[in-house]
């Protein structure tokens, strides 16, 4: 039996890193992920008829991955991006009720959060960082209250050994409206009075951007190694790559040779 069907003219995404569908046989419902309003959001449907009961999340931001569903309390724990101020590729943990009420960010600390939870989700740890700020691990409870700082990475030795901090930036895309984000790497001997060739590290494709993950990394690919050869190295998540709105992702659908990266980066 076919309960529900969604058809799109371009890509269909069921989530960012995996499928966000869930079936709840006890209550005769299912959770559906859709980008039909241009952003990836969650919807609750009747399992028998397929009819929409209610939209759970909404707005100009996206649900990334459903991590846990509590069918007793009717709460959904999920990661999202673009709702908090700043870089839309930063990942935060949220909790929301099945009916769409009670949406709360459980990890408001700025950065990309990696979550590990107890089986009952009464407690969890979050390790968060940015491209320039090293990881901090916190222990929190189900309500998002911080119980303890578990660990803070010390990068003093990196700094003593001339580690170079990447520079996060945003510029307007090809339409002069959309903000696109990237990282810039300078050689350790950089002199603002000198000219340097620019190496644009392009990875075009609808499945991934050039950066994607803006968490802390001692060495992201060979970006800094190339910079040390005398280049200014940049990587940009251009229009046509995932992790943003559907229209952003669809920017060069069906025309990969056009490589959106070139249109946004030149």
Located regions from the model:
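Beta-strand C-termini and the immediately following turn/loop, strongest in propeller blades
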Residues: 21-37, 70, 77-87, 125-131, ...
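Structural motif
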Residues: 39-43, 87-92, 133-138
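Serine-hydrolase catalytic core recognition
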Residues: 105-107, 112-264
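C-terminal, active-site-flanking charged/polar segments
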Residues: 51, 68, 93, 222-225, ...
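Secondary-structure transition/capping motifs at alpha-helix termini
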Residues: 36-37, 45-53, 85, 174, ...
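Multi-bladed beta-propeller domains
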Residues: 1-19, 45-72, 81-83, 96-113, ...
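Short coil/loop residues immediately preceding or within conserved phosphate-binding loops
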Residues: 18, 27, 39, 88-91, ...
């Amino acid at each position: 039996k076919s309960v529900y069907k969604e058809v799109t003219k371009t890509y269909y995404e069921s989530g960012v890193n995996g499928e966000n569908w869930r079936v709840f046989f006890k209550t005769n419902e299912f959770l559906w992920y859709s980008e039909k309003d241009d952003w990836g959001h969650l919807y609750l449907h009747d399992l028998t008829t397929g009819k929409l009961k209610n939209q759970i999340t909404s707005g100009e931001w996206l649900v990334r991955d459903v991590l846990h569903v509590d069918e007793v309390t009717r709460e959904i724990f999920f990661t999202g991006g673009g709702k908090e101020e700043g870089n839309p590729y930063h990942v935060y943990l949220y909790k929301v009720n099945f009916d769409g009420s009670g949406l709360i960010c459980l990890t408001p600390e700025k950065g990309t959060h990696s979550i590990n939870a107890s089986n009952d989700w009464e407690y969890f740890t979050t390790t968060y960082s940015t491209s320039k700020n090293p990881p901090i691990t916190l222990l929190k409870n189900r309500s998002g209250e911080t119980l303890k700082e578990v660990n803070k990475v010390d990068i003093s030795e990196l700094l003593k050994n001339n580690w170079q901090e990447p520079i996060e930036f945003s510029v307007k895309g090809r339409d002069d409206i959309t903000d696109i984000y990237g990282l810039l790497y300078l050689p350790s001997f950089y002199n603002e009075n000198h000219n340097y060739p620019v190496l644009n590290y392009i990875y075009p494709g609808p499945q991934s951007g050039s950066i994607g993950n803006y968490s802390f990394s001692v060495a992201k690919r060979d970006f800094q190694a190339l910079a040390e050869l005398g280049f200014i190295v940049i990587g940009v998540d251009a229009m046509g790559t995932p992790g943003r709105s559907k229209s952003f992702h669809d920017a060069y659908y069906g025309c990969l040779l056009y490589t959106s990266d070139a249109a946004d980066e030149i």
